[in-house]
């Protein structure tokens, strides 16, 4: 976390961000940077040094008119994990990251499809493809209407009681190609109980997702939003905001050897804008559908 603070201080400066933008187009020396920025050489050199000290750029000696120093960008992206020590050491929590292709039931309507890290799975816009054995390799799945359902193993220790269950997943709407303004009413069910509906604002593309493979055209869906559903004794919450009065007691978690999760768009949804679900090798977040199930000691 200390390193993240140091890097944030370095890039929290307009001149240094502009230097990184210029270096995204290719290597430059300080004179070239100063000219493009319209800044004095000395000011540019100071900012270059700060970026170099933070390991955000590298400086190399290259032959030219004599020998000159040339700066290059060292990273295309920076990821900061915001997990605290208390989260990392949390006890009495069962965490399962479910691959998006491991659903046990589905009912989907076109436009629909599944995509692995390297190719399409089955045929596009053909619901039969959702039953292909290769679906387990899916890193992106999408459909306009319907649902997919997952079953997590129920690992609550005998004699213990669950007090909170949480699901996190990267998700967005499903439009032709992509469309930022394309609302979709997405509903979540746990153990057959409707938890609530969230209206996703759009289907996001035009800018490549951090983990989206290069072969996947930029005009298609690229990334989603990371959403967190949480159910405890106080009710059901989406990103910390209560969305229903369903409590964890209503889910009867101790009655079955599994915990079911259904994600879908209802037939009568006001905004029937579909769903895209992302795996770790598509979108912006390296995860499937994570369940955190907390129980007493």
What residue spans do the PLM features occupy?
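Extended, solvent-exposed segments with strong compositional bias
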Residues: 128-143, 199-254, 271
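A short beta-strand element within beta-rich, extracytoplasmic domains
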Residues: 161-180
